[in-house]
Design a protein with these regions (language model features):
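Core dinuclear metal-dependent hydrolase active-site scaffold
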Residues: 12, 47-115, 191-237
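Alpha-helix capping/helix-boundary segments
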Residues: 6, 30-31, 51
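Helix-loop-beta element that forms the nucleotide-linked donor phosphate-binding surface
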Residues: 34-48
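Metal-dependent catalytic neighborhoods of phosphoester/phosphodiester hydrolases
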Residues: 10-20, 39, 163-173, 198-199
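Cap/insert and terminal regions of metallo-dependent hydrolase folds
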Residues: 23-32, 94, 102-191
C-alpha cells in the first residue's frame, strides 16, 4: 500500500484481504489505518524510503522508494504518514510501482540503486497541468519511464475513479499515440485482467467500446470533451 489516500487504501478492500491472512507492506504510519481496519499487527510491515522487507518464503522482496506526493484521509492529518513508490523483486524479475507521484529527479537515483526493471507501473490518470508536482499524467509518465531506464510500461491509476476533469480514456489514448514514438513497449490489459508482460500482445484499444453507454438506439459517449480551466482545484488524492 503506497499511501493512505482513499483510492489507494480502501476500507472494504482491506477488510476482505485481511480475512485471507496475507501480509501487508506499506509506508511509515499507514499501519495504524490497517490495524483499525482489522489487519493483525503481526501482518503489517511499515517501510521508510530505501528500506526493504522480504516476505515469508524468501522469494519476494519489497523496497520502498521516494515519490513526490502527500498523504491524509481527513482535515487534520495532512502528511502525517509517508507516501512511497515500491520496488518488488524476485530472483528473476524486478517491478517498479510508482504509487501517486509528480515527476521527480529521484527516478534517476531509484534506477541507480534499485534498477533495472522488467516492468514499470506508472500512474497516468487523474492529472492536470497545475497538479504536475503530485501527479504524472501520460506525458510526464513517459519522461519518468525514461528516467527509470525503461522496461515494459504498464499504465495504472486511470479509468476507474473519476478524480479529474479530463475524459476517462484520455491517458490511454495519449499513451497509445506517443509511446511508439519513443520505442516504449506498452502493456495495457483490460482492467483486472491478468497479463504476462513478456507475452503481452500488441495493445488493442479495448476502452473505446467500454466508454460508450447504449440506451435504446441512442449512444451516449462518456468521454465528452470538457472545458478544463488553466488552474484546477487542489486534488484530494
Amino acid at each position: 500500500v503506497s499511501h493512505d489516500h482513499y483510492d489507494h487504501l480502501d476500507y472494504g478492500t482491506v477488510r476482505a484481504l485481511a480475512k485471507t491472512g496475507v501480509p501487508f507492506v506499506t509506508s511509515l504510519g499507514v499501519g495504524a489505518h490497517l490495524e483499525a481496519f482489522g489487519v493483525p499487527a503481526g501482518l503489517i510491515t511499515e517501510l521508510d524510503w530505501w528500506e526493504h522487507h522480504t516476505l515469508p518464503g524468501g522469494e519476494l522482496a519489497v523496497t520502498a522508494a521516494p515519490s513526490q506526493h502527500f498523504s491524509g484521509r481527513g482535515l487534520k492529518d495532512r502528511n502525517a504518514t509517508l507516501w512511497s513508490s515500491m520496488v518488488i523483486r524476485t530472483a528473476k524479475h524486478s517491478v517498479f510501482f510508482s504509487g501517486d507521484t509528480g515527476l521527480t529527479t529521484e527516478y534517476g537515483l531509484i534506477r541507480e540503486r534499485l534498477g533495472p526493471f522488467d516492468l514499470v507501473m506508472l500512474e497516468v490518470g487523474a492529472f492536470h497541468p497545475s497538479w504536475g508536482d503530485i501527479h504524472l499524467g501520460p506525458d510526464n509518465a513517459l519522461e519518468a519511464h525514461a528516467l527509470l531506464g525503461g522496461g515494459a510500461f504498464l499504465p495504472v491509476h486511470w479509468g476507474t475513479f473519476s478524480l479529474a476533469m479530463h475524459a476517462w480514456d484520455e491517458p490511454a489514448e495519449t499513451l497509445l499515440a506517443r509511446a511508439p514514438e519513443r520505442g516504449v513497449q506498452l502493456v495495457m490489459p483490460r482492467l483486472g485482467e491478468p497479463v504476462e508482460p513478456v507475452q503481452a500482445e500488441r495493445v488493442t484499444p479495448w476502452w473505446r467500446s467500454a466508454g460508450s453507454l447504449h440506451a435504446g438506439d441512442t449512444v451516449v459517449t462518456e468521454a465528452e470533451a470538457l472545458s478544463v480551466p488553466k488552474v484546477a482545484g487542489w486534488p484530494l488524492d
